[in-house]
Amino acid sequence: SNQKSTYAPVCQMKYLVDLKDGAVKAFNDYSKSFIKMGNASSRLTLTSLINYVSRDDEQNIAYCSSLRETIEQAVEYSKNYNPSFTEKQKAELNKLSKDIKNEINADYFLVDLIKKGIAFHVGYLPASIRKRIEDAFKNHTIKTLFCTSTLIEGVNLPADNLFITDYKNGRKNLDKVSFKNLIGRIGRIDHSLFGNVFMVCLPNSDVKTIDRYADLLINDIPEQSLSIESTLKTHQKKAIIKGLLNNDFEMSSKHDKTTNSEFNFMRKEALIFINDLRNNNESLIVKQLKKFATPDQIEIIKSNIKQIEPTKSIDISPDQFKNLKDFVASGAKYPDLLPDGTVDYKSVVSFLTDLGNIYKWSIYEKRTLGYTDKITSNLSHVTWYANILYKWMSGYGLSSIIYGAIQYKEKYPETGIWANNWKIEDYYDKNNPKHKNYVIADTLNTIENIILFSVANYFREFSTEYKLQNGNKSFDNDWYEYVEYGTTNKITILLQRYGYHREAASYINSHKNELIDFSITTDIAPFVLKKKLLLNCPDESTKIETPEIYINIPELFIEE
């Protein structure tokens, strides 16, 4: 056969390093057992371990279970790390550091880490920055990368040494498939002939850590089943049937007894189930849930869903949809823009509050948009989200949005510090660099996962219903579009439709007098872009993105 694999497994050495008692063990892949090699110094830390085992020409990946741990371990490692670089590498790292400083914030830990060839790789980083970090690692300019599970999720970055600091992925255990995927980063034939995997038991690791590492290494991957079969437990599937029998789409019996992700998965399954039942579609979900209901109960559920108006979306349930229809029918619309074309903060707060009521966020988004003050029962996070949302839709740059978020925390320190929707500190201390970095991380995470996902979905449903009731295919002042593109500016929106990321599109628009020729129109745009000037402009993202867009849409450019 002429077929060949780009990557092939090579020699992997696996070690267990217990920083509590200093024990170092090697794993024998054939006997499926650990062999004690000796004891390390009592002063051994993760930082000194990484430095001790890796040569100057080797690259390291350190896996951490949480965003907080990832950032803190990267900062700790940087304190005693002084690598040597070529002049070309120094220039590349300094340029990347400067761009992160300008695009995000001067006090962001990543700004100084990058200069030392260290980075952290987390999902909320802007796509352009994340891509450049990945490229710098592939080019051996970045030597050590601290990461969360984003590395498991499709990012192809091989390394020489992998340090696993926890058996968890967030609050859940790392499953065997994900673990094998993770250690597969080490030992690829086009990168190195062998690699080392170090499973590290940190001083603060729980007592299960060593046993869990052993289980992940020794035992084979169990037979896999579809997520719709395995994600929900039996009692949760029974709760879905019970809820639907009583038209209880809120799943009241489980609302406060499940995690946010489990509750959301229950809702999705329930909504798919009733849509498939309505359409007589014997899907896998229907087959699964029918196991927990009698034929008579299925008939009752079918009778119930005949009484409710069907929704085409599985993002909102029938009770939410009814509230939405009534809200739009009452004359609701998106608030008007300000005279300068930007979005008003108070209008955003008011509109989000209205949506929170009709969409029942306190029930369906209890950890984020619907987080409720225990004393007042108000949606206490709405002002925080509105502070970010109105600037995002108005086209503010990330650095400006982050600066505003930091100011918000300084004004309302009692709102505390949050990481991944969990409160980690009760008060914000403006003099604490860690607190500022947590706010930066929370802001970027809010944009990525709340604004661009949750809010965008709810705005899309509102816009769809508004167009339906008003007989429009499109309409001006569509906030769903403003959220999707992060601006109200028509030129910036067009540039993003053609392939530029938001920051590059904003840069081009802000320099339109030099970079855009409005005297020439085409079938696809009321302007053309000046290719040569774009390729030589100071903005790195614009220079990187332009060649690919030119290949795909050459008629958008002139050579000038």
Language-model segment annotations:
Residues N102-C147:
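Conserved helicase ATPase core of P-loop NTP-dependent helicases/translocases
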Residues R130-D135, L145-D160, L182-L193:
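SF2 helicase motor core recognition
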Residues E58, K115-K116, P158-N161, S192-V197:
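Short glycine-/polar-rich loops that comprise or flank the Walker A/P-loop
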Residues S84-D112:
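Short mixed-charge
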Residues S1-Y77, A119:
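Conserved interdomain linker/interface between the two RecA-like ATPase lobes of SF2 helicase motors
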Residues D206-N264:
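Long, hydrophobic alpha-helical segments
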Residues I241-F273, L277, N281, K290-A293, ...:
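C-terminal accessory/interaction regions of large nucleic acid-associated machines
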Residues L157, K168-I218:
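Conserved segment of the helicase C-terminal RecA-like domain
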